C-alpha cells in the first residue's frame, strides 16, 4: 500500500482558549490525498503541552533552525512571558514551542512518529493519543509523563536518569534538538542528535558540545528504550552540528548515512561545513566523508539525501 502523504504545517487564524487568533508555528501535522485534500489533522497544541519549556529555556540563543543570530551565539535562551507571537522561541500556540522537523509513519499500527526539536520524539496514533515519548522527564504534565519511555540497558535493567536526562554509569543519552527521527528497515529508531541544550543546560564552554548519529530499540509493550548504537560523540566539537542535519540507515550496505549540515556555524568568517558521512555499522569505520562548504559564512545547509535513480524511475 502507498504511504500516506504527511506534511508539517502551521495553522492560520488559530483561535486560542483566550479568544486570541494566532498563526501557529510548525505544530500541525496534516495528511493529504493525491488531489491535495486534507483528510486528517494532528493538532499538537491539543495532543502535547505547548506550555512545556524544559528544553526551550536551555537552548543556544544563537541558532534556532535556520534563524541564525551570531550576536547571541553561546548564550542561553531567555523565555519572556510577553514574547510576541510569531517564529520566535516561546510557549503556547502562536510561538515556536514545538518545531516539528520530521515525520515517520509506522504502518504496523497506523501511527506517526514526530521529531519535535523543542520537546522530544513522540509517537501518536490515528486516534490522536500519545503512544510514547522519548525525552527527559522534566516538565511534562501528569498525563504525558505516563507516556515517557524508560531507559534500560541491554539486559532490560532500568537505568538511573535524572529529570534533565543525565544518566549514571551508562552510554545511554537522550537526544536534544534532534532531527530525522526515522524508522529503520530493522524496526529501530534512528535519529540525528544535534545536541544543543544537552542535559537541559548550556555547557561551561561552547566547545564542549557534540552531535551524534544514534539508534534506539523501543519495546512499546514494556514502555522501554535501549540505545543500541551511536557515532560522533568521540569526534567532539569538530563534528557538532547545532541545527538541521539527517541520518538514515542503509540496509543494502549495512551503513549509517549522515549529514551534519551546520558544522562551524558559529565560527566567524569560516565557511559552514555540511559533512556527508557513510559509517560502517559494525566497525564504525568512516567509509565516506565529504565536506560541502557553503558560499556564505554562518549560513547553514539543510539536508542531504541519498537518491536511487533506478528505484525512482522504474
Regions found by a protein language model. Give the residues of each.
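Histidine-/acidic-rich catalytic cores in large beta-rich domains
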Residues: 4-314
Amino acid at each position: 500500500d502507498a504511504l500516506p502523504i504527511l506534511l508539517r504545517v502551521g495553522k492560520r487564524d488559530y483561535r486560542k482558549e483566550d479568544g486570541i487568533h494566532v498563526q501557529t508555528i510548525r505544530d500541525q501535522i496534516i495528511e493529504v490525498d493525491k488531489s491535495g485534500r486534507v483528510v486528517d489533522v494532528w493538532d499538537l497544541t491539543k495532543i502535547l503541552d505547548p506550555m512545556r519549556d524544559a528544553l526551550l529555556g536551555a537552548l543556544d540563543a544563537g541558532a534556532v533552525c535556520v534563524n541564525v543570530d551570531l550576536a547571541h551565539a553561546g548564550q542561553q535562551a531567555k523565555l519572556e512571558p510577553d514574547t510576541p507571537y510569531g517564529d520566535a522561541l516561546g510557549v503556547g500556540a502562536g510561538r515556536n514551542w514545538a518545531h516539528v522537523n520530521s515525520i515517520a509513519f509506522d504502518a504496523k499500527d497506523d501511527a506517526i512518529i514526530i521529531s519535535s526539536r523543542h520537546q522530544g520524539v513522540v509517537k501518536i496514533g490515528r486516534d490522536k493519543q500519545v503512544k510514547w515519548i522519548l525525552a527527559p522527564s522534566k516538565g511534562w504534565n501528569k498525563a504525558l509523563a505516563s507516556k515517557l519511555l524508560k531507559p534500560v540497558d541491554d539486559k532490560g535493567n532500568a537505568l538511573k536518569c535524572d529529570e534533565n536526562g543525565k544518566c549514571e554509569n551508562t552510554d545511554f543519552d537522550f537526544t536534544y534538538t534532534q532531527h530525522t527521527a526515522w524508522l529503520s528497515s530493522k524496526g529501530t529508531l534512528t535519529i540525528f542528535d544535534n545536541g544543543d541544550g544537552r542535559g537541559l543546560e548550556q555547557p561551561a564552554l561552547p566547545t564542549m558540545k557534540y552531535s551524534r548519529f544514534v539508534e534506539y530499540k523501543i519495546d512499546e509493550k514494556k514502555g522501554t528504550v535501549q540505545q543500541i548504537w551511536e557515532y560522533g560523540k568521540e569526534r567532539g566539537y569538530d563534528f557538532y552540528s547545532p541545527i538541521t542535519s539527517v541520518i538514515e540507515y542503509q540496509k543494502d550496505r549495512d551503513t549509517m548515512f549522515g549529514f551534519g549540515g551546520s558544522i562551524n556555524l558559529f565560527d566567524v568568517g569560516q565557511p559552514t561545513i555540511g559533512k556527508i558521512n557513510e559509517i560502517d555499522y559494525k566497525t564504525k569505520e568512516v567509509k565516506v566523508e565529504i565536506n560541502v562548504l557553503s558560499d556564505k559564512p554562518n549560513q547553514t545547509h539543510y539536508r542531504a539525501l541519498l537518491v536511487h535513480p533506478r528505484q525512482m524511475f522504474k
